[in-house]
């Protein structure tokens, strides 16, 4: 605004959790917006900071992940159920810092009969009927060999009706070698976590960057 005064704004989306592996492990989601002023005591004029765009890229990857996790189905069922997913990812890079993804999920949620409210379910549910299939799209933010990603999918098949027709997954991936990628992610149902999964992926680069 003036030689010594400036205005700044910020926003944040936070999730706070007690970090428990067993229920209750509910978290709190908060949205924070802020605005303030700063006074700069130095007499020199504030330097102008030039913004730089990340180098453009147009390479393509296929990444296949096999993930495994365990979780408690609900607050009143203290059993721990195995879960996992086979995820096929198609990534197209926009720059050295970002990429888009699309693909298909094959999900096994061991606690599904007890996490979802199905009064008609009585007795044992076969493992095959605890499987789900879906398609998804997502966004990746790349920091060297590590990336943070958010994906939103829609169910195409399920024997047990999930609580919502769409599901989010968010997590972190790290490139271990040129072809192997580690995965840590949360499979959720809107703002409710269903299970945390760890996995290993294989990367197939089929188009090199030409920019």
Each predicted region: which residue ranges?
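Transmembrane beta-strands of outer-membrane beta-barrel pores
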Residues: 13-19, 39-41, 66-72, 106-110, ...
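Outer-membrane beta-barrel "beta-signal"
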Residues: 29-48, 193-211
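Residue-level detector of the transmembrane beta-barrel scaffold of outer-membrane proteins
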Residues: 6-10, 36, 61-65, 99-103, ...
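Residues on the lipid-exposed face of transmembrane beta-strands in outer-membrane beta-barrel proteins
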Residues: 1, 11, 35-39, 86-92, ...
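Residues that define the transmembrane beta-barrel architecture of outer-membrane proteins
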Residues: 27-33, 58, 80-86, 129-133, ...
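Glycine- and aromatic-enriched membrane insertion/assembly motifs of diderm outer-membrane
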Residues: 80-132, 136-140
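Repeated loop/turn-to-beta-strand initiation elements of outer-membrane beta-barrel proteins
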Residues: 3-7, 43-46, 96-100, 145-149, ...
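Outer-membrane beta-barrel translocator domains and adjoining extracellular loop/strand segments
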Residues: 19-26, 48-52, 74-79, 113-119, ...
